Protein backbone atom coordinates (compact mmCIF):
# COMPACT_ATOMS: atom_id res chain seq x y z
CA UNK A 1 0.00 0.00 0.00
CA UNK A 2 1.15 3.54 -0.74
CA UNK A 3 1.21 5.57 2.47
CA UNK A 4 1.63 9.32 2.33
CA UNK A 5 2.77 11.35 5.34
CA UNK A 6 2.39 15.11 5.72
CA UNK A 7 4.38 17.28 8.11
CA UNK A 8 5.62 20.83 8.50
CA UNK A 9 9.31 21.52 9.06
CA UNK A 10 9.54 23.58 12.28
CA UNK A 11 10.92 27.10 12.42
CA UNK A 12 12.49 26.88 15.87
CA UNK A 13 16.25 26.91 16.10
CA UNK A 14 16.68 24.15 18.69
CA UNK A 15 14.93 20.81 18.37
CA UNK A 16 15.22 18.26 21.15
CA UNK A 17 14.39 14.57 20.67
CA UNK A 18 11.23 13.53 22.54
CA UNK A 19 9.66 10.23 23.53
CA UNK A 20 6.10 10.70 22.28
CA UNK A 21 3.77 8.42 24.23
CA UNK A 22 0.65 7.10 22.48
CA UNK A 23 -2.44 5.23 23.61
CA UNK A 24 -2.30 1.46 23.15
CA UNK A 25 1.09 1.52 21.41
CA UNK A 26 4.58 0.12 21.82
CA UNK A 27 7.26 2.11 23.62
CA UNK A 28 8.32 5.16 21.58
CA UNK A 29 11.76 5.94 20.21
CA UNK A 30 13.25 9.42 20.60
CA UNK A 31 12.55 11.77 17.69
CA UNK A 32 12.47 15.49 16.96
CA UNK A 33 9.53 15.00 14.61
CA UNK A 34 6.21 13.45 15.72
CA UNK A 35 5.59 12.29 12.14
CA UNK A 36 8.59 9.95 12.46
CA UNK A 37 6.88 8.19 15.37
CA UNK A 38 3.69 8.01 13.28
CA UNK A 39 5.68 6.35 10.49
CA UNK A 40 7.16 3.84 12.94
CA UNK A 41 3.67 3.03 14.23
CA UNK A 42 1.91 2.69 10.87
CA UNK A 43 4.43 1.43 8.31
CA UNK A 44 4.07 -2.24 7.45
CA UNK A 45 6.23 -4.60 5.36
CA UNK A 46 5.58 -4.08 1.66
CA UNK A 47 4.31 -0.50 2.04
CA UNK A 48 5.54 2.25 -0.25
CA UNK A 49 6.21 5.60 1.41
CA UNK A 50 6.24 9.21 0.41
CA UNK A 51 6.43 12.25 2.69
CA UNK A 52 5.21 15.76 1.93
CA UNK A 53 7.20 18.35 3.89
CA UNK A 54 5.83 21.90 4.13
CA UNK A 55 8.61 24.39 4.78
CA UNK A 56 9.41 28.06 4.68
CA UNK A 57 12.73 29.09 3.20
CA UNK A 58 15.09 30.14 6.00
CA UNK A 59 18.19 28.87 7.79
CA UNK A 60 16.33 27.19 10.65
CA UNK A 61 14.02 25.17 8.40
CA UNK A 62 16.96 24.20 6.17
CA UNK A 63 18.80 22.78 9.19
CA UNK A 64 15.68 21.10 10.55
CA UNK A 65 14.86 19.65 7.14
CA UNK A 66 18.29 17.99 7.01
CA UNK A 67 17.68 16.56 10.46
CA UNK A 68 14.33 15.20 9.30
CA UNK A 69 16.04 13.54 6.33
CA UNK A 70 18.55 11.94 8.70
CA UNK A 71 15.80 10.49 10.90
CA UNK A 72 13.91 9.23 7.85
CA UNK A 73 17.07 7.58 6.52
CA UNK A 74 17.27 5.58 9.74
CA UNK A 75 13.85 4.15 8.79
CA UNK A 76 15.04 3.33 5.27
CA UNK A 77 13.24 6.28 3.67
CA UNK A 78 15.39 8.01 1.04
CA UNK A 79 15.49 11.72 0.21
CA UNK A 80 13.84 11.10 -3.16
CA UNK A 81 10.75 9.86 -1.29
CA UNK A 82 10.37 13.31 0.30
CA UNK A 83 8.63 16.10 -1.60
CA UNK A 84 9.03 19.68 -0.35
CA UNK A 85 6.15 22.14 -0.52
CA UNK A 86 7.55 25.66 -0.19
CA UNK A 87 5.60 28.25 1.77
CA UNK A 88 6.22 32.01 1.54
CA UNK A 89 6.54 33.78 4.89
CA UNK A 90 3.10 35.39 4.89
CA UNK A 91 -0.40 34.38 5.93
CA UNK A 92 -2.42 35.97 3.13
CA UNK A 93 -5.46 33.92 2.09
CA UNK A 94 -4.16 33.54 -1.46
CA UNK A 95 -0.88 32.13 -0.12
CA UNK A 96 -2.66 29.59 2.07
CA UNK A 97 -5.08 28.63 -0.71
CA UNK A 98 -2.06 28.07 -2.95
CA UNK A 99 -0.52 25.77 -0.34
CA UNK A 100 -3.82 23.90 -0.05
CA UNK A 101 -3.86 23.45 -3.83
CA UNK A 102 -0.25 22.25 -3.82
CA UNK A 103 -1.00 19.72 -1.08
CA UNK A 104 -4.03 18.35 -2.92
CA UNK A 105 -2.07 18.13 -6.18
CA UNK A 106 0.83 16.34 -4.44
CA UNK A 107 -1.38 13.67 -2.87
CA UNK A 108 -1.62 10.48 -4.97
CA UNK A 109 -5.00 9.42 -6.28
CA UNK A 110 -4.81 6.15 -4.34
CA UNK A 111 -3.18 6.32 -0.91
CA UNK A 112 -3.67 6.32 2.84
CA UNK A 113 -2.66 9.65 4.38
CA UNK A 114 -1.28 10.43 7.83
CA UNK A 115 -0.85 14.11 8.69
CA UNK A 116 0.99 15.78 11.56
CA UNK A 117 -0.20 19.28 12.54
CA UNK A 118 2.28 19.85 15.38
CA UNK A 119 4.60 22.36 13.72
CA UNK A 120 4.07 25.47 11.64
CA UNK A 121 1.99 28.62 11.99
CA UNK A 122 -1.52 28.48 13.43
CA UNK A 123 -2.95 28.45 9.90
CA UNK A 124 -1.18 25.23 8.87
CA UNK A 125 -3.66 22.81 10.55
CA UNK A 126 -6.55 24.59 8.81
CA UNK A 127 -4.80 24.32 5.44
CA UNK A 128 -3.89 20.66 6.01
CA UNK A 129 -7.39 19.61 7.09
CA UNK A 130 -8.95 21.53 4.19
CA UNK A 131 -6.58 19.82 1.75
CA UNK A 132 -7.47 16.39 3.17
CA UNK A 133 -11.20 17.14 2.86
CA UNK A 134 -10.78 18.27 -0.75
CA UNK A 135 -8.56 15.33 -1.66
CA UNK A 136 -10.98 12.80 -0.17
CA UNK A 137 -13.69 14.26 -2.40
CA UNK A 138 -11.64 14.60 -5.59
CA UNK A 139 -9.22 11.66 -5.53
CA UNK A 140 -9.96 8.14 -6.70
CA UNK A 141 -9.32 6.27 -3.47
CA UNK A 142 -7.76 8.41 -0.78
CA UNK A 143 -8.25 7.50 2.87
CA UNK A 144 -7.21 9.56 5.90
CA UNK A 145 -5.50 7.20 8.32
CA UNK A 146 -4.74 9.72 11.06
CA UNK A 147 -4.28 13.37 11.98
CA UNK A 148 -1.69 13.78 14.74
CA UNK A 149 -0.64 16.44 17.21
CA UNK A 150 2.44 16.16 19.41
CA UNK A 151 2.11 17.88 22.78
CA UNK A 152 5.12 18.60 25.00
CA UNK A 153 4.49 19.71 28.59
CA UNK A 154 7.22 21.72 30.29
CA UNK A 155 7.75 23.23 33.71
CA UNK A 156 10.57 25.67 34.46
CA UNK A 157 12.14 24.79 31.14
CA UNK A 158 12.16 21.05 31.88
CA UNK A 159 10.18 18.55 29.81
CA UNK A 160 7.56 16.78 31.91
CA UNK A 161 5.98 14.65 29.20
CA UNK A 162 5.46 14.28 25.46
CA UNK A 163 2.24 12.84 24.08
CA UNK A 164 1.13 12.08 20.53
CA UNK A 165 -2.61 12.40 19.94
CA UNK A 166 -4.59 11.18 16.93
CA UNK A 167 -7.22 13.82 16.13
CA UNK A 168 -8.77 11.86 13.25
CA UNK A 169 -12.04 11.38 15.16
CA UNK A 170 -12.65 15.15 15.02
CA UNK A 171 -11.85 15.23 11.31
CA UNK A 172 -14.22 12.33 10.63
CA UNK A 173 -16.93 13.87 12.80
CA UNK A 174 -16.83 17.09 10.79
CA UNK A 175 -16.98 15.11 7.54
CA UNK A 176 -19.92 12.95 8.57
CA UNK A 177 -22.05 15.75 9.98
CA UNK A 178 -20.99 18.32 7.39
CA UNK A 179 -22.25 16.18 4.50
CA UNK A 180 -25.79 16.00 5.87
CA UNK A 181 -28.28 18.49 4.47
CA UNK A 182 -31.06 17.86 7.02
CA UNK A 183 -30.08 19.86 10.12
CA UNK A 184 -32.21 17.76 12.48
CA UNK A 185 -30.61 14.51 11.32
CA UNK A 186 -27.16 16.11 11.43
CA UNK A 187 -27.75 17.24 15.02
CA UNK A 188 -28.88 13.75 16.07
CA UNK A 189 -25.89 12.09 14.41
CA UNK A 190 -23.53 14.65 15.96
CA UNK A 191 -24.80 14.00 19.49
CA UNK A 192 -24.80 10.23 18.94
CA UNK A 193 -21.19 10.27 17.75
CA UNK A 194 -20.13 12.41 20.73
CA UNK A 195 -21.94 10.01 23.08
CA UNK A 196 -20.21 7.00 21.49
CA UNK A 197 -16.79 8.65 21.73
CA UNK A 198 -17.28 9.43 25.43
CA UNK A 199 -18.06 5.77 26.09
CA UNK A 200 -15.49 4.13 23.85
CA UNK A 201 -13.26 1.49 25.39
CA UNK A 202 -9.68 2.59 26.03
Language model feature labels by segment:
Residues 1-112, 133-202:
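Long, low-complexity, Lys/Arg-enriched
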Residues 115:
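Detector for conserved single-position "signature" residues within domains
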